[in-house]
Amino acid sequence: MAEERQDALREFVAVTGTEEDRARFFLESAGWDLQIALASFYEDGGDEDIVTISQATPSSVSRGTAPSDNRVTSFRDLIHDQDEEEEEEEGQRFYAGGSERSGQQIVGPPRKKSPNELVDDLFKGAKEHGAVAVERVTKSPGETSKPRPFAGGGYRLGAAPEEESAYVAGERRRHSGQDVHVVLKLWKTGFSLDNGDLRSYQDPSNAQFLESIRRGEVPAELRRLAHGGQVNLDMEDHRDEDFVKPKGAFKAFTGEGQKLGSTAPQVLNTSSPAQQAENEAKASSSILINEAEPTTNIQIRLADGGRLVQKFNHSHRISDIRLFIVDARPAMAATSFVLMTTFPNKELADENQTLKEANLLNAVIVQRLT
């Protein structure tokens, strides 16, 4: 054993050119393992250039000089340098000691991108797929939106007094769907759509949405809002700002009311037919339908004499029907009412039940004021 240690000591001195005491220190620290001792020496400040390490057994090493048939091994063959970009993607690397001739490399978890880097990736991906940077334009108070050109009919005036005017029909505009304009605001800790709530960058449920933006695609949830129409998406950079939810714009009351003094409350519908149709369309679009799950049609007979038919999933709850009625008839929000079945005539008291649990598939529901 003593002779092997002397051989290792002489070989360490021959390879590194250091003093014998310093060589003994590194060998003792490495348990007299020549390979580990050399690695520790160069990590401690030794030259990182190519070094010659004998691979022969200690008994075959001549005293004083390195053997002539050594195999050349570089220090970089012992510890592999990693590219900076690869380290960022794969995580930090650690080396754990093993047996005398082995070791283990441990790769840490991938480093998460900071919100600033994530926003950079989103804008970079959008620009690579055709997005154009524009200056933000803010409307002054009282400024209206761009007027739409008139597309109706009219009368062509006669050229002479005795010539009658002729009616000319206008061209009917074709609408294949509902065009939607959405503003995506990228904040310090998350993003928001228009004046909606903050959605975290780290939330797994938002990963598909952000990946679609990075690929220059319109996310599926925005395409569903358009119902086949065009989606115009604007991206605003607020990465240095904390999210502040804007105050909702004031809207004058245009709903329905009740006549006071009558024994049974009578709902008065003060909205115009166009406004009522718009409310019903908004209420219908607020019900998210999963086409992969079974669906059913529910007929609702309202207290004001109206009738609504809406598609639901079997997993929707009775409370979803109540919300649908309030959205379709905003005046009902201030009205106390219950939902009942027609036959048998029974009140649906537990509104947490699903439509399937309450046996309401393809059923007729009646609204009764209380």
From Swiss-Prot:
GO terms for biological process: establishment of mitotic spindle orientation; negative regulation of protein localization to centrosome; positive regulation of mitotic centrosome separation. Residues 291-368 form the UBX domain. It comes from the Eukaryota. One of its GO terms (cellular component) is nucleus. PANTHER family: NSFL1 COFACTOR P47, UBX DOMAIN CONTAINING PROTEIN. Part of a ternary complex containing STX5A, NSFL1C and VCP. NSFL1C forms a homotrimer that binds to one end of a VCP homohexamer. The complex binds to membranes enriched in phosphatidylethanolamine-containing lipids and promotes Golgi membrane fusion. Interaction with VCIP135 leads to dissociation of the complex via ATP hydrolysis by VCP. Binds ubiquitin and mono-ubiquitinated proteins via its N-terminal UBA-like domain when bound to VCP. This is NSFL1 cofactor p47. It comes from Mus musculus.
